[in-house]
Amino acid sequence: MGAFSKETYVTRNFQKISGKRWELYVITRVIHSLNDPDIEYVCQQYIIPPKNNEYYLADLAFPSLGLYLEIDEGQHGDKDHKIADIKRDAEILEATDWECKRIAVFLKKGNTKIDKKLSELNNEIDEFVQYVRHKKETLIRSGVKIEWDYEKKFHPESYIEKEKIERVKNVTANKN
């Protein structure tokens, strides 16, 4: 195989968000609660919409499930940011066909934003985890294979055999 192991990949994913305390909290709770090695995830998934030169980073993406999670910190409560989020979500949908779910880590009290209590936030995270599990089960029942074969994902041969690469399939390969 190429550059690094699945273990290194997983821990580097968390390292990418170590400076964002709420994002780190929510994402690590989601992943540890899921405890499912067959569900691929990516922190800070890079997404380029087809109609502009900007790019977006999805906080937590589940490519095989067609799903991503945005963790809304305080700035997402501002009117301008809410409008930007709507545009962003529409462009990500167009680029990936992925469903977006959001978890806000703050409450708005008048003009003030305060952090949610961990117990309330944990309940929302647990609901999201149940949603992810249900989505996986639904896809499997419809005949979709959900398996995170880390080594295969990064081998170009996997895509050469298919003789086709689709932009929305989250293709990745290591340079050997």
Predicted regions: what they are:
Residues 1-176:
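Nucleic-acid endo/exonuclease domains
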